[in-house]
Amino acid sequence: MIERRETRAKTDGAVSASRSRGRRARALTAISLAPLTWLAACAEPRDPGGQPLAEVKAPTATHAPSAKPGPAPPPTLRPSVGAAAFEPRLVRLEEGAMGTRIVIQSFTTPELEEASLKGAMLAALEEIRRLERLMTTWRDDSEVSRINAAAGGEPVAIGPDTFAVLEKSLWIAERSEGTFDISFEAMKGLWRFDEEKSDAIPSQKDIDQARKKIDWRKLSLDREARTAKLGEAGMRINLGGIAKGYAVDRAAAVLEQRGLAAFYVQAGGDLYVRGKKPDGKRFKVGVRDPRGKHDLDYFATIEVEDHAFSTAGDYERSFIKDGKRYHHIIDPRTGWPASACRSVTVWAKDAFMADAIDDAIFILGPEKGLALVESIDDAGAVIVDASNKVWISKRLEPHVHVFRRPTDAP
């Protein structure tokens, strides 16, 4: 039997999410498809003298490392002067990669000064950019582009990273009734929610024609040879719905290898939180109101430690036409935007899993979606369905505080 709870409104509190400079705010992370903001201790990090803390300057994409993976260098430990009076400082990196905003934050410790944290963050960013070059469809020489170019032909040899993401994609497709299908790229251009945004609605004829090239079962993987093959000419894959979660986990691994014990890594709506705040308390994640006024408008919070989050929502890449909302989460079984939910926030042990299942849960709807998430170890979900009801998976209930109903609007 599916374990679920329908949560009604609670009015026992509210979250302050001011961006004003220097103003103290709660330790809260906004989780949404929009870029997230980590409010760990104050709205803007400052040093003990009150001066704003400069962000890490990241290299441009042209300075990304080679595609050849290698072990992260050992941590650089530099004992701080006056450790007895040590006060942690927030260090932040913000850059663009994988078509979204990358944010990495951590605190200085007596063993890891600001320079060491900056070096670790830049190494983590470089790892994300290395993976981007392998899995993007914007480069003809990426492994994903080479698989697409060879559709209907011979298998394509790929590296272990891309193979791992493809393998997980097929695993989720099978468990989600095909609602997560990376061969959905065949519909590219019909719906335009990104760079070339348009409110033009494709015809049913065009949708049906494109859907003939969508079938995850025609992607063949050979683990021994480490190859991938699309079985029909004209088929295409896109890893945009899962690769960012994998990249977040790999970046987190780099930070851990550099000696960081408390940090967060965010790529768009995918987030991993490691450790606790300097005061020993857990961080909190804010769950965005899908019809809220801005991306820091929350209706619930979740305590988090050593876990990841990923959100799928109908409110970012979307448009409203003739009173109806159209958004980028397309049901591959119909070719039309899924209509069962407004938002899904997935909690999991790693970002790879969270990113892999949030869209599937969104498309399946609350009952089947909760059944899916409960079937996966150490995973949970908060769902706002199309009628604005809030559903919380049994495993996640003890960690969630819903303090008001989400806004009810189209």
Which stretches of residues belong to each language-model region?
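Mature catalytic core of soluble alpha/beta enzymes
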Residues: 2-6, 12-15, 19-410
